[in-house]
């Protein structure tokens, strides 16, 4: 099996795990467990807490002491146990702590997946800019497949969605141990920053990187809103008679999955845009795309305004990919191998935590 196929499997499962619950869990907690809006928001805020702390710490461990692919696998195995426990939760406190523990080990895997992929592609003399986006697009396909699976089976309204996530996380955790070794960097004459694993913080000394991380924080805030409340927002139209039986209400998760379908197209366009416009222009395009995303989503409805909702989903693909994937590639190019995992962890901490 070629290295590209092996990485495709990894990326597919990585986002299948997330897609099995990320979009639909809020609706399940609101409609079936009767959690209040503030409680749902607090549970999803654990994603920010986990992103603020863990990616950097796990990245440091991968850079200094532990093979990244093994650490990646362990995180998913622990995450599988947490999701299984979350599936049994019926109260707010249970669900909060279960999802916090799950996200503490899941969020670091987003950056570790990139580190493992980049390392494997470099080992096999592949071109990152050319070869990584077509591999990463399978992560989005995995996310879409998970969303459709939980919607069409009716799992979006039950704890079964968490069982799906737990099983797929366990499979990925075991599979990860078969991937090419991504060993810690062995450096001599370590500085004080290196000794404490804080190497990536030196990137803030460079004006270009400091500005990049600032905008990453702002765009990262926009990323979380529809993930948390999108399904609940569309489900709220069920209270309006003319929209109650509409496709957008009955199959809200499938409607939201158009966003991820759009991602698959824009991921493939990233090499072209980076080559012809550069990272600054690509990130600027992303900023404008986010404005249109929320404007269309806010004014649309499942009836005559369905076209605005659909267009909003399509624009999301550009907004997300041009920010998230291009940003990760930019960090990879601007850092050396000794701090690469730490730098990727820092990037995800800023975009998903702050």
Task: Say what each PLM segment does.
Residues 1, 179-214, 239-244:
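Juxtamembrane intracellular "pre-TM" segments in multi-pass secondary transporters
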Residues 1-48, 208-243, 251-255, 324:
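Helix-loop boundary and gating motifs at the non-cytosolic
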Residues 12, 82, 92-111, 116, ...:
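Hydrophobic core of transmembrane alpha-helices in multi-pass small-molecule transporters
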Residues 42-60, 254-269:
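Central cavity-lining transmembrane alpha-helices of secondary-active solute carriers
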Residues 77-91, 288-302:
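C-terminal ends and interior cores of transmembrane alpha-helices
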Residues 161-178:
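Symmetry-related core transmembrane helices of the 12-TM Major Facilitator Superfamily/SLC fold
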């Amino acid at each position: 099996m070629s290295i590209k196929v092996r990485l495709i499997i990894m990326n597919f499962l990585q986002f299948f795990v997330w897609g099995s619950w990320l979009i639909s869990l809020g609706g399940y907690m609101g409609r079936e467990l009767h959690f209040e809006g503030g409680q749902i928001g607090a549970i999803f805020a654990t994603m920010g807490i986990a992103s603020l702390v863990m990616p950097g710490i796990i990245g440091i461990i991968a850079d200094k002491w532990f093979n990244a692919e093994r650490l990646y696998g362990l995180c998913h195995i622990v995450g599988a146990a947490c999701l299984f426990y979350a599936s049994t939760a019926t109260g707010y406190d249970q669900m909060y702590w279960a999802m916090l523990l799950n996200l503490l080990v899941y969020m670091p895997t987003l950056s570790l997946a990139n580190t493992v992929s980049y390392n494997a592609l470099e080992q096999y003399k592949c071109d990152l800019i050319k070869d990584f986006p077509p591999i990463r697009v399978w992560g989005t396909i995995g996310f879409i497949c998970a969303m459709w699976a939980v919607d069409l089976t009716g799992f979006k309204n039950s704890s079964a969605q968490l069982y799906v996530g737990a099983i797929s996380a366990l499979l990925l955790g075991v599979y990860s141990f078969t991937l090419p070794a991504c060993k810690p960097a062995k450096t001599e004459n370590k500085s004080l920053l290196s000794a404490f694993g804080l190497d990536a913080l030196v990137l803030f000394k460079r004006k270009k990187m400091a500005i990049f991380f600032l905008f990453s924080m702002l765009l990262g805030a926009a990323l979380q809103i529809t993930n948390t409340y999108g399904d609940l927002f569309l489900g709220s139209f069920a209270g309006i008679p003319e929209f109650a039986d509409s496709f957008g209400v009955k199959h809200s998760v499938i409607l939201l999955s158009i966003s991820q379908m759009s991602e698959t197209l824009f991921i493939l366009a990233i090499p072209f845009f980076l080559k012809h416009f550069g990272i600054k222009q690509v990130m600027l395009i992303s900023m404008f795309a986010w404005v249109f995303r929320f404007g269309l989503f806010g004014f649309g409805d499942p009836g005559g305004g369905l076209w605005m909702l659909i267009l909003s989903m399509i624009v999301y693909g550009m907004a997300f990919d041009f920010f998230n994937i291009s940003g990760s590639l930019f960090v990879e190019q601007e850092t050396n191998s000794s701090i690469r995992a730490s730098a990727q962890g820092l990037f995800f901490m800023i975009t998903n935590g702050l």
